[in-house]
Amino acid sequence: MLRKLVCGLEIHTQLKTGQKLFSLSSTEASKPNTNISFFDIGLPGSQPTLNQACLLTALKACVSLNSNINSVSTFDRKHYFYPDQPNGYQITQYYRPISSGGFLKLSKRFDEIDEDEKLVRIHHIQIEQDTGKSLYKDLSDKSLVDYNRSNMPLIEVVTEPDLNSVKQVKAFLRKYLQLMKTMDVSTGQLEAGAMRVDVNVSVDDGERVEIKNMTSTSAIVNAIRYEFKRQTKSIDKGNPIKTKETRGWDGNKTFRLRDKESSVDYRYMPDPELPPVVLDVNDIVTRIKKMTITTPEEQLAQLMSPPYNIKLRDARILLNDRNLLGYYYALFSRTSAKNIPSKYPINWCCHEFLGYLAKNNIDFSEDLFPVHQLADLIDCIFREQVTNNNAKILFEHLLANPAENEGPIIDLITKYELGEVDVTNDSELLAQVDSIIDDVLDTYPAIVKELQEGNKPGSINYLLGQCMRTSAGRIKSKVFESRLKEKIHIIK
């Protein structure tokens, strides 16, 4: 019997602001327990003051998620004791959140889901403060607490249980994170704790189980897969899930933490030290919409259409980094002005440039390789002044030795003797080409035989690669390819 996955998300997103939610402490990363105020560590007599920048940033998130902003919202205390919660309560919005309702739409074209469209409803969005961070590593009987994170501004976005597949969950999280980055709501740096997700999983109409505090998409996806299988096996054995519980994820399996708390357990009460937030909703929505830029979906559509014609995967890579996107636009502008096809700038930007950086664990910066230099290098390739292979050699050399990246690219190609050799009317060079090919054919007779018999036609690319390597990439692959085919035919 096919079982149905029913999944809802509670996404805790750290807001991109300079100061904390209810104090003047900086939100910058720093040494433990240095960015703290009296209120952050719960000293008696300290009181909260709402940071207006946090409120505005949260409202931008509400508008971008099509959520209905409430004209009056309030702050409440959620009581529980834990070492990283010095006040003994967390300030959140239980009774009257900043907004209610909303949705995020997924599509087959942009999000690669199976359905043509999928509407994921938002139940509500609330503003709340983060806790401190407990540290247990390498300490057997003690724990440390870093209060730098205490009182950091968060929004909690609670979805309806509308997600029915792992593919939908991945698509939703990717789109949500991209939207928050584009709208400048969050840094989107998952490794720095910018987003933590609680997942509610149930099977068919069974009771839901909550999996707490996951910080990566892979962890979320794997936890959902495991929990779905666990619940399905239990149901198939005649043991339906009847009790709400909270579970953790250890990287391999979910494990029981406790029974799911109810609102009574947290003893919610209005915070007497914080006044209600009263908003002119029409005015604030109008102002925020004027501030917002093109949505990620609109940007994807633009990049995937003429004149850019970028594939979805590459367009997503560009959107993940504003600086990279700006670099690409500048590169495209320079290359298109020289009538160079659109495949060149995206290939060099996303594959050659980012590939080198990933291999060497370097963060992207437009200063690593000036855009005008890369445009000139692409122009030299297009005009057959350098082969693609030798262009890569020069590119990687200049990235590793930036002090040498001065002067015209064509001069650097000449300096390092990387220029493409024209063999068309040079009998001596043509003889050299034939000699290289003969050596390669003699070295790999088995491949030659396969090609002559019509088997594995793609094997010619291997022979071609050997020829290019011998010539140090200075002779066009097309020259070798045509001569190779001729010689293999002659051998026949």
UniProtKB/Swiss-Prot annotation:
Enzyme class, UniProt record, top EC level: ligase
Reactions mediated catalytically: L-glutamyl-tRNA(Gln) + L-glutamine + ATP + H2O = L-glutaminyl-tRNA(Gln) + L-glutamate + ADP + phosphate + H(+)
Pfam family, one: GatB_Yqey
GO BP annotation list: glutaminyl-tRNAGln biosynthesis via transamidation; mitochondrial translation
GO molecular function: ATP binding; glutaminyl-tRNA synthase (glutamine-hydrolyzing) activity
Miscellaneous comment as given in the Swiss-Prot or TrEMBL entry: This protein may be expected to contain an N-terminal transit peptide but none has been predicted.
Function: Allows the formation of correctly charged Gln-tRNA(Gln) through the transamidation of misacylated Glu-tRNA(Gln) in the mitochondria. The reaction takes place in the presence of glutamine and ATP through an activated gamma-phospho-Glu-tRNA(Gln).
Protein name: Glutamyl-tRNA(Gln) amidotransferase subunit B, mitochondrial
Originating species: Komagataella phaffii (strain GS115 / ATCC 20864)
